[in-house]
Amino acid sequence: MPTKSIKIMVEGGNVKPGPPLAPTLSQLGLNVGEVVKKLNEATSSFKGMSVPVTIEVDSNTKKYEIKVGIPTTTALLLKEAGASEPSGDPAHKKIGNLSLEQVIKIAIMKKPGLTTKSLKAAVKSMLGTAKSIGVTVENKDPKELVKEVEEGKYDDLLAKYENEWNEVKE
């Protein structure tokens, strides 16, 4: 079964039937409107974010499968913080504040793409990204929180999400 993979970045829940997607789908004999509708349904939970998508097409049967990737850590943090873009000067200009719980949820969402093995390490990685884009966490510099996480100050909160972390497949 010869398959063709189409890898594209789409705006979550807002895929349009235009180039470069439409001509590619047409060449493969697929119904463009139907594929676009399914793409919008599959990416609706990432509305307004850039989402990596792979469409696997069986060239013989014209059957296809849509695989939705996970947006970048930056995109997820910005969405949670209600900001549209990173700070141009993250050291001095803050663009939003998140709770540590929000950061933990993003870490869990990103687990399949991370090389870290523990939730604690993943959260520290998310905090590093938050610092670089000008997002504070718990109204503090994320660097401070990294230290507090290492010291065990948030072990109870992390333990609350440990099962959820362990259930996510890598």
Swiss-Prot record:
GO CC annotation: large ribosomal subunit
Alphabetical GO biological process terms: translation
Protein keywords: Ribonucleoprotein, Ribosomal protein, RNA-binding, rRNA-binding
Function of the molecule: Forms part of the ribosomal stalk which helps the ribosome interact with GTP-bound translation factors.
Subunit structure: Part of the ribosomal stalk of the 50S ribosomal subunit. Interacts with L10 and the large rRNA to form the base of the stalk. L10 forms an elongated spine to which L12 dimers bind in a sequential fashion forming a multimeric L10(L12)X complex.
Stored HAMAP family: Ribosomal_uL11
Protein name: Large ribosomal subunit protein uL11
Taxonomy of the source species: Archaea, Thermoproteota, Thermoprotei, Sulfolobales, Sulfolobaceae
